[in-house]
């Protein structure tokens, strides 16, 4: 979070850290010199409406938003930033770079996970090409900062549901689907799911359900 910043009424008026520089927005916009004495302006603005949800687990409704920064050159850089609900106002955090000249599609909060859907170019395509490759990034709060914890390729998705681990049963029941699915196979991801379950439930009885958010493809 920007040093010395105070909570404000709207996330569109908060101060965010973009590339380690504090950027104070006014009605979703900020303009400042690209460098001391430079004639070129650095423009930062909010893209679309903020998305609201609890990111830090304190029960308050935080906000996430797209920030677009035009440094006056050929690039247009897209960031995701969070504004945390504190003392009745919003305090801006550190912006996370998503890409240069991408096409943002969706910004959502799912059980504290920030989900970013966008289009980018395929590897090797020129920057002048229109973005057509669907991608998903997801971010979580780590050490008081929004952090990119992974990305999803086309066909992959994030699903929340109940994981049950016992002596003979390993199952996953998605919240949107009442039917339980067996967790089988030799994927390293399965080992990570089991390890996370046991870390979260170190003294729980076997077959105690645990709500988890899983990412990948079926």
What are these regions (language model features)?
Residues 1-26, 105-158:
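Acidic, small-residue rich beta-repeat scaffolds with periodic aromatic anchors
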Residues 72-81, 124-130:
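Structural motif
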């Amino acid at each position: 979070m920007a040093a010395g910043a105070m909570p404000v009424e709207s996330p569109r008026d908060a101060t965010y850290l973009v590339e380690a520089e504090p950027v104070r927005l006014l009605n979703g916009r900020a303009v400042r010199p690209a460098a001391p004495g430079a004639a070129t302006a650095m423009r930062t603005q909010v893209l679309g409406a903020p998305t609201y949800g609890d990111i830090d687990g304190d029960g308050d409704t935080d906000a996430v938003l797209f920030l677009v920064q035009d440094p006056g050159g050929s690039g247009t850089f897209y960031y995701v930033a969070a504004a945390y609900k504190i003392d009745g106002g919003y305090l801006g955090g550190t912006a996370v770079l998503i890409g240069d000249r991408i096409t943002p599609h969706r910004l959502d909060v799912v059980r504290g996970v920030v989900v970013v859907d966008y289009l980018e170019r395929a590897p090797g395509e020129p920057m002048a090409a229109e973005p057509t490759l669907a991608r998903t990034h997801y971010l979580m709060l780590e050490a008081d900062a929004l952090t990119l914890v992974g990305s999803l390729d086309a066909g992959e998705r994030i699903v929340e549901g109940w994981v049950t681990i016992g002596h003979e049963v390993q199952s996953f029941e998605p919240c949107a689907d009442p039917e339980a699915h067996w967790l089988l196979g030799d994927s390293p991801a399965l080992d990570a799911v089991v390890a996370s379950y046991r870390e979260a439930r170190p003294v729980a009885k076997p077959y105690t359900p645990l709500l988890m958010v899983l990412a990948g493809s079926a």
